[in-house]
């Protein structure tokens, strides 16, 4: 049984040694993530080339994800670089950019004074130190320190429950996205998205520069949660970024939010990624905790298309072992899924198109005939995406002549992309797709398969289903 849940591996110093990326692909990596909060364009380009070369050697499609730094709110400079903040003392966030000390420091978001009020909580350095706002004095924010802790230059500031007037993308984000377009990357994981207009702004930037990257907003603050339905409607997928989300909303709310986001993404057939601290202990240990195994397993049971490794592969001591463990967990969970129940549950929902209805029928047919695979030759990826929505037990083999389409649908649950030549007719399409599935080992002689494809020749735009045995 082939793994259906996609694994995203963050690239970094731990993946740089020769052979590591090859081992990640062999162990189950489907997508490579590049975190543009760190590193230079030159460093990322070297890693992009390394992934592409390894994918070529493996004969597999590997998608590339550009994760933006985002419009973060951060502290300014401390004169000494770092200070010790003491519980109960006053600490002022200043409009002025002069170097700070243990009594004050600047903040880069200059409108913050107009967006907070007395009683609001601000969190520094991912929640390490809490501040409560006492008063707004001109454009300065006077606070009381809630707990002692060290603090240093440029640490992040979070404002839980407050919608901030931050831009959708920073100047750095714009430069990074243009770099991604120029280097044919596939997805933008857009940090700190608060509203649908943020997504539209990024889409406009991509179109302006002739790009085709799909946009995956990261839901990591209360505004993103509150505006989720509208954000989902204009997005190509969603990432549940649990690390920052757990700072911005109460930690006990994160599992509830995660499940609801997955449910809504599944309902409309858009891919959803669950990220952050999934196998965190494997950064330094060769084996995960039992809680981490359960966390990964539950994300898969809930319906995640993809699960992501961050520091585990970027800077950890056991990057390959982490991917192997994630693959093992995914396979075990997928063996336990009640595919017939999933098909029945999703058949209740209103289907919006002929392709939607035919895709559901295809999955039902594949289940009832015990087909080994569903073959989806595709020009645009549309049929493949809709088939994936219904979570078939059979492997989805997508034969695509367009490299960009092959990489985009590769993020989808259960889809194995094959990049092939453009076909010349219906029979050539069927033959090419079947040969490709055989040569890649996704099917074998004697396997029963279901083929579904949108026809664009003389069939008037129809969708056809064919059941056949591989010979």
Language-model-detected regions and their locations in the chain:
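Non-catalytic helical/linker scaffolds that mediate oligomerization, partner binding
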Residues: 1-471
């Amino acid at each position: 049984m082939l793994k259906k849940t996609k694994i995203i591996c963050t690239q970094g110093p731990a993946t740089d040694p020769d052979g590591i990326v090859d081992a990640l692909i062999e162990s189950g990596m489907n997508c490579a993530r590049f975190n543009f909060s760190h590193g230079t364009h030159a460093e990322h380009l070297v890693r992009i080339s390394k992934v592409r070369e390894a994918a070529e050697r493996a004969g597999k499609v590997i998608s590339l994800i550009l994760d933006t730094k985002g419009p973060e709110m951060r502290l300014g400079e401390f004169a000494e670089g770092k200070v010790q903040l003491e519980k109960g003392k006053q600490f002022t966030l200043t409009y002025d950019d002069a170097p700070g000390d243990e009594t004050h420091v600047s903040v880069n978001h200059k409108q913050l004074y107009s967006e907070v009020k007395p009683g609001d909580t601000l969190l520094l350095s991912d929640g390490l130190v809490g501040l409560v706002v006492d008063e707004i004095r001109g454009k300065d924010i006077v606070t009381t320190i809630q707990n002692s802790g060290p603090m240093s230059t440029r640490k992040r500031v979070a404002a839980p429950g407050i919608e901030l007037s931050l831009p959708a993308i920073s100047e750095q984000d714009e430069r990074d996205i243009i770099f991604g377009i120029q280097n044919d990357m596939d997805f933008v994981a857009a940090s700190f998205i608060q509203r649908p207009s943020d997504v539209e702004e990024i889409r406009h930037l991509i179109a302006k520069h002739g790009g085709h990257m799909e946009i995956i907003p990261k839901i990591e603050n209360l505004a993103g949660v509150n505006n989720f339905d509208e954000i989902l409607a204009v997005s190509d997928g969603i990432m549940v970024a649990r690390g920052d989300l757990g700072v911005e909303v109460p930690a006990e709310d994160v599992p509830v939010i995660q499940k609801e986001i997955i449910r809504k993404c599944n309902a409309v057939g858009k891919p959803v990624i669950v990220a952050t601290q999934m196998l965190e202990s494997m950064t330094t240990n060769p084996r995960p905790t039992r809680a981490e195994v359960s966390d990964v397993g539950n994300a898969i049971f809930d319906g995640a298309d993809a699960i992501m490794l961050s520091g585990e592969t970027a800077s950890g001591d056991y990057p390959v072992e982490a991917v192997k463990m994630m693959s093992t967990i995914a396979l075990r969970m997928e063996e336990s899924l009640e595919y017939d129940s999933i098909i029945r549950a999703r058949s209740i929902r209103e289907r919006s198109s002929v392709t939607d209805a035919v895709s559901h029928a295809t999955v039902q047919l594949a289940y009832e005939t015990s087909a080994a695979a569903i073959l989806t030759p595709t020009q645009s990826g549309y049929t493949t995406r809709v088939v994936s929505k219904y979570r078939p037990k059979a492997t989805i083999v997508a034969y695509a002549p367009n490299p960009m389409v092959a990489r985009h649908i590769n993020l989808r649950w259960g889809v194995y992309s094959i990049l092939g030549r453009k076909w010349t007719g219906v029979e050539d399409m069927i033959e090419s797709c079947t040969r490709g599935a055989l040569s890649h080992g996704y099917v074998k002689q004697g396997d029963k398969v279901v083929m579904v494809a949108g026809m664009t020749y003389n069939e008037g735009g129809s969708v056809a289903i064919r059941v056949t045995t591989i010979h």
